[in-house]
């Protein structure tokens, strides 16, 4: 028995001595990440997604299915969903980190251009070098009550098939019949109709700040000093001569429109808190014997995995998750024992070693019903595309 007041110091030495005796080797044994079997990982990911979707839609529980109309979705709603899905598919798989305001779901709205029979188009009918598209800002304001709520606005035009290559330009209508240049594009020959998309977020935000009225865009042939042919050879659905019967309906439905994504006013009041977002998105710290931190595939079927019938499109999606070890190096040049002790003191539930976490995430467009009204919304950060050690 040691005398009273004395301690056996050797008991405190093994960890530092191990670090000194094994310089340059991974300290995998020091990780506080727990080994979790794959099925448990998947179950936790599914439950996290259940909470994410309800939270992003500001729903305390899944909507009732009792009043949902039977049959397929209305054509206009399906067209809006398809437009949103196509836009997401066309974006980069490695987006910039989204600001906190992008946590909540965005309501997606389609605002059609003013009908071609409106008198505002009278002065533009005989112009061959341009086509004109006008929008009523009161329609836009219905979807976006306040300019800061607007997340993104796109002008979408359906170009009909063409055998001609042409350089085109887009302009924004200013006061006193002046036009502001926005951008250009080279259109190559195509055998099928194709959608053209232009980012006009800043323009629409400007319109919302100016008040109600009629605003518009001009889509023109590039004017070259070397060419005498300034005629626009591009046909746009909804602007070229109207078809009859069913073709006329499709023609009208596909006329140019603004695709608006905005945070609903009631959700904007909850943007001050970011803790809830982090708790849902990065609550788990994984480590296993698998090689490398990387994306693991996980498909979620809304009916089978979540027991939900209220999401009409899509039926499911590849949510994916991150898994794999993240070793780091301990050596004589990197004495982290004091820092590690301090870190553990202030973060008792956190991992002492790097963990495999999502790096790039993509949004998920959905169609669901509120009562008997179908809604199209875009849920941010729902699909894991790449992972990193952090």
Swiss-Prot record:
UniProt site positions, description: Cleavage: 278-279
Signal peptide segment: 1-29
Pfam name, any one: TGF_beta
A GO cellular-component term linked to this record: neuronal cell body
Top-level taxon of the source organism: Eukaryota
UniProt GO BP: adaptive immune response based on somatic recombination of immune receptors built from immunoglobulin superfamily domains; animal organ morphogenesis; aortic valve morphogenesis; ATP biosynthetic process; branch elongation involved in mammary gland duct branching; bronchiole development; canonical Wnt signaling pathway; CD4-positive, CD25-positive, alpha-beta regulatory T cell lineage commitment
Region feature (Bowtie tail): 226-252
Tissue: Expressed in cardiomyocytes. Weakly expressed in the mammary glands, with a slight increase of expression following onset of involution.
Intrachain S-S bonds: 285-294, 293-356, 322-387, 326-389
UniProt keyword Disulfide bond present: yes
Protein function: Transforming growth factor beta-1 proprotein: Precursor of the Latency-associated peptide (LAP) and Transforming growth factor beta-1 (TGF-beta-1) chains, which constitute the regulatory and active subunit of TGF-beta-1, respectively.
PANTHER family: TGF-BETA FAMILY, TRANSFORMING GROWTH FACTOR BETA-1 PROPROTEIN
Protein's recorded name: Transforming growth factor beta-1 proprotein
Gene that specifies this protein: Tgfb1
């Amino acid at each position: 028995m040691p005398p009273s007041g004395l301690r056996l110091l050797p008991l405190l030495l093994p960890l530092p001595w191990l670090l000194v005796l094994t310089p340059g080797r991974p300290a995998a044994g020091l990780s506080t990440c727990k080994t979790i079997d794959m099925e448990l990982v998947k179950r936790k990911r599914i439950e996290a997604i259940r909470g994410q979707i309800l939270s992003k839609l500001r729903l305390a529980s899944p909507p009732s299915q009792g009043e949902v109309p039977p049959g397929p979705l209305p054509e206009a709603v399906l067209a809006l969903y398809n437009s949103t899905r196509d836009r997401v598919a066309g974006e980069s798989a490695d987006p910039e980190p989204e600001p906190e305001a992008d946590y909540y779901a965005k309501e997606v709205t389609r605002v059609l251009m003013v009908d071609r029979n409106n008198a505002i188009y009278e002065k533009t009918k005989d112009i061959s070098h341009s086509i004109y598209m006008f929008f009523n800002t009161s329609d836009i304001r219905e979807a976006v009550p306040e300019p800061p709520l607007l997340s993104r606005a796109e002008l979408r035009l359906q170009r009909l098939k063409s055998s001609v290559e042409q350089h085109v330009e887009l302009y924004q209508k200013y006061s006193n019949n002046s036009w502001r240049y926005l951008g250009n594009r080279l259109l190559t020959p195509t055998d099928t109709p194709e959608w053209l998309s232009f980012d006009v977020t800043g323009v629409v935000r400007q319109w919302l700040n100016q008040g109600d009225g009629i605003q518009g865009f001009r889509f023109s042939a590039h004017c070259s000093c070397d060419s005498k042919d300034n005629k626009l050879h591009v046909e746009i659905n909804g602007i070229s001569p109207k078809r009859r019967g069913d073709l006329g309906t499709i023609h009208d439905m596909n006329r140019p429109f603004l695709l608006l994504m905005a945070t609903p006013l009631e959700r904007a009041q909850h943007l001050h808190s970011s803790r809830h977002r982090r708790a849902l998105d990065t609550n788990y710290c994984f480590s296993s014997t698998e090689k490398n931190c990387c994306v693991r595939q996980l498909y979620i079927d809304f009916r089978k995995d979540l027991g939900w019938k209220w999401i009409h499109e899509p039926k499911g999606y590849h949510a994916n998750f991150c898994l794999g070890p993240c070793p780091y190096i301990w050596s004589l040049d990197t004495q982290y024992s004091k820092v590690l002790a301090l870190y553990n003191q202030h973060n008792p539930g956190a991992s002492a070693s790097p963990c495999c976490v999502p790096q790039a995430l993509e949004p998920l467009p959905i169609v669901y019903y509120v009562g008997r009204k179908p809604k199209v919304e875009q849920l941010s950060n729902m699909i894991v595309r790449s992972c990193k050690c952090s």
